[in-house]
């Protein structure tokens, strides 16, 4: 170091770390821009004044229709609820003969048929034991 002189020593002590700091700063700025591009946070950093436009469509599902051979069309009704058990009143509790999830099929009449393999009727029961309806007329 003694052979280089005073100015060379000054350059080695101050200019060398300055060049290293500049290179480090440039690389950090480059990495920050790369991170902004990767994570798509450009719009959150530079907020523009453009109003946002929201586009949406209103669609109604097609109602299923059954047509008979003579040309009569019936609107098939799909109830939105499914039945897991049927309450038979205070004295009998819940019905266990058709236990399990009972999803209603498409029906054309006002009385639904549960999906347990046979029509579900309460005609054999006395009036006071007939449960309250779990379905509405016309569903």
From Swiss-Prot:
Membership in a protein family: Belongs to the coronaviruses ns4/ns4.8 protein family.
Protein name: Non-structural protein 4
């Amino acid at each position: 170091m003694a052979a280089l002189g005073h100015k060379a020593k000054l350059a080695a002590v101050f200019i060398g770390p300055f060049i290293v700091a500049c290179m480090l700063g440039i690389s950090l700025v480059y990495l920050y821009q790369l991170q902004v591009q990767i994570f798509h946070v450009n719009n959150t950093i530079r907020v523009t004044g453009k109003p946002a436009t929201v586009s949406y469509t209103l669609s109604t599902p097609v109602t299923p229709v059954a047509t008979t051979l003579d040309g009569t069309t019936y609107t098939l009704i799909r109830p939105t609820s499914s039945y897991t058990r049927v309450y038979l009143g205070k004295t009998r509790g819940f019905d266990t003969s058709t236990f399990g999830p009972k999803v209603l099929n498409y029906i054309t009449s006002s009385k639904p048929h549960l999906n347990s393999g046979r029509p579900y009727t309460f005609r054999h029961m006395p009036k006071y034991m007939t449960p309250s309806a779990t379905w509405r007329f016309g569903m």
